[in-house]
Amino acid sequence: MPVSYMEIDLRAFRHNLRVIRSHLKNVPALAVIKANAYGHGAVECLRAALEEGCVGAAVARVEEGCVVRASGFDCPVYVLGLPLPEEMSVGVNEELILPVDDTTNLEAL
């Protein structure tokens, strides 16, 4: 049975970011690194993205935001998916930017 393998060329990734940033001018950009940067390595991709001018990160879940923080990043980290009420305090403690969709999550803050 074949094994899938993927490797990202960070030089090409950085080049692509520079091209995108050149079109955005002064518009802040986030690095969307959910699902381990779609399998490319969230930590490595975020480091490169921040060095190329991105201002923060977006992740799918609180757990992914915790990985960003545990890796030493202090940039803004937006959680795109709705956290469970019991995850709200973790997100707050990790200084993640959390979505709130109802009073249950609001009260959990």
Task: Place the predicted regions along the sequence by residue.
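Active-site-proximal beta-alpha core segment in soluble small-molecule metabolic enzymes
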Residues: 4-7, 12-14, 25-109
